[in-house]
């Protein structure tokens, strides 16, 4: 059992026969009245998102989630295929289950697939990935008085903000949890 006050992004729990993962949370302590936890939850099976409020002392049943490292193979336009490195079994996943991670995954990269009762429900990209910048505007000399950022499109199609000294064709390291530029490689 976990208390609602301990909910964090990514926590998975069971409630009313359904399994939810926390997409976003906010601990609220109003000046008057009792504290509460406002959450945005995603049903791991249906993919639907709901807003729910909990009392911080409420107890929730923690869900048993299996995490397995698998290799991203390819996409056929509708489904994304991942392969288990031990059994070489391939599993197809629809976009709704990979949308958070796919913008940072190239073919043959490894990712963590989360399973609940044998059914895959989420993909987690590695914390840091190295990707090539395919398009960005050139930096202008003299724009260095402050920390100036510009948008850059990566080889996977993701758009991140990078410093003005990063040029097209360079490889950069990106934190996939926040989508932020870390450094040039």
Swiss-Prot record:
SUPFAM superfamilies cross-referenced by the UniProt entry: Nucleic acid-binding proteins, Translation proteins SH3-like domain
Superkingdom of the organism of origin: Bacteria
Places the protein is found: Cytoplasm
Annotated Gene Ontology cellular component terms: cytoplasm
CDD domains on file: S1_EF-P_repeat_1, S1_EF-P_repeat_2
Pathway where this protein functions: Protein biosynthesis; polypeptide chain elongation
NCBIfam families: efp, PRK00529.1
Function: Involved in peptide bond synthesis. Stimulates efficient translation and peptide-bond synthesis on native or reconstituted 70S ribosomes in vitro. Probably functions indirectly by altering the affinity of the ribosome for aminoacyl-tRNA, thus increasing their reactivity as acceptors for peptidyl transferase.
Entry's family note: Belongs to the elongation factor P family.
Protein name: Elongation factor P
Protein's gene: efp
């Amino acid at each position: 059992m976990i208390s609602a006050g301990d909910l964090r992004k990514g926590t998975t729990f069971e409630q009313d026969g359904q399994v939810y993962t926390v997409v976003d949370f906010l601990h609220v302590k109003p000046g008057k009245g009792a504290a509460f936890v406002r959450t945005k939850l995603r049903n791991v099976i249906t993919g639907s998102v709901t807003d729910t409020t909990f009392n911080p002392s409420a107890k929730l049943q923690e869900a048993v989630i299996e995490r397995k490292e698998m290799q991203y193979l390819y996409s056929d336009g509708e489904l994304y295929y991942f392969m288990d490195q031990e059994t070489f079994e391939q599993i197809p996943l629809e976009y709704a289950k990979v949308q958070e991670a796919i913008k940072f995954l190239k073919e043959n990269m490894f990712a963590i697939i989360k399973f609940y009762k044998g059914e895959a429900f989420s993909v987690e990209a590695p914390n840091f990935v190295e990707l090539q910048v395919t398009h960005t505007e050139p930096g202008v000399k003299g724009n260095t008085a402050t920390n100036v950022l510009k948008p850059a499109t990566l080889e996977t199609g993701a758009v991140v903000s990078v410093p003005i000294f990063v040029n097209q064709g360079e490889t950069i390291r990106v934190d996939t949890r926040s989508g932020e530029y870390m450094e040039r490689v």
